């Protein structure tokens, strides 16, 4: 049975529930006696309460499994005792979806913390869980040695043999070989698949590999050639734009990133990257794009960028800053104000 990764609509419901509980969290925070330093800020206490709330959702067996899984994934944003305990319990759950959620949470952690949660699932009874555990830990391969490699290597070998013999399987094999520095094996797969499947996702995967070995010229050639057949592919324009940006060709990068955003304006990442580069030359365009992607996605990072750009341009940012104060930590907003409004 296939188990999908956490549905982000469920994650959104968790976040909305947390926001609705915000004021009650503040009230509860006021009643908590701080440990040690009495100058612990209310923001820190509220963050702890949010973490506790997510941990409670994660472990509440009365809730639907998708909501528990979404809460578990969001615990990856924290690394306090509540997160550690809840994610560890999820990793041992009888429900594969909870174990997958534990992996997604730990994926946001670093080094040993990630390893300790995920490594026991390298030989999970559920194939989807086992596969996701391998995919999560393989990125640590260049930094591992000794017993860690001894534990991970056979899991990777087993995973490689179980991958399907189709395009998806081959692209994943090539990605794994790249992480293991088996560049010749990776390139043989990419080249063969590109010659037989000149479609955007294959070209992009091959180009990303080439960028990784600092061959941007070849990567750009692959992307431009594929764009001839697929001129409406936003992903191709975006990948090409990033390649130009890597080598300092900022105007070429700007044109390609603008193309990507115009072709797929609902993609927040495309808009954010384009606007961040565009504001060097066209601050009004950047403001327009930041405002649009924030309205579409309501990501605090997009709102922060909008406020910052308004301040850079010397425009009225009061309404933007007021909204930012409702979704971002107070110290973040205060520091932004001080950069442009020191008095």
Give the positions of each predicted feature.
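Structural detector for internal amphipathic alpha-helices that build alpha-solenoid repeat scaffolds
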Residues: 32-46, 66-78, 89-92, 97-111, ...
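Amphipathic alpha-helical scaffolding segments comprising HEAT/armadillo-like alpha-solenoid repeats
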Residues: 47-58, 80-92, 111-123, 144-158, ...
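Short coil turns that connect the paired helices of HEAT/ARM alpha-solenoid repeats
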Residues: 58-66, 91-97, 122-128, 161-165, ...
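Structural marker of alpha-solenoid helical repeat scaffolds
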Residues: 78, 109, 124-125, 162, ...
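Helix-start (N-cap) detector for alpha-helical repeat units in TPR-like alpha-solenoids
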Residues: 96-99, 127, 167, 199-201, ...
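Structural signature of tandem alpha-helical TPR/SEL1-like repeats
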Residues: 112-115, 148-154, 180-189, 213-225, ...
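Terminal, low-structured helical/coil segments at or just beyond the last alpha-helical repeat
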Residues: 297-300, 304-343
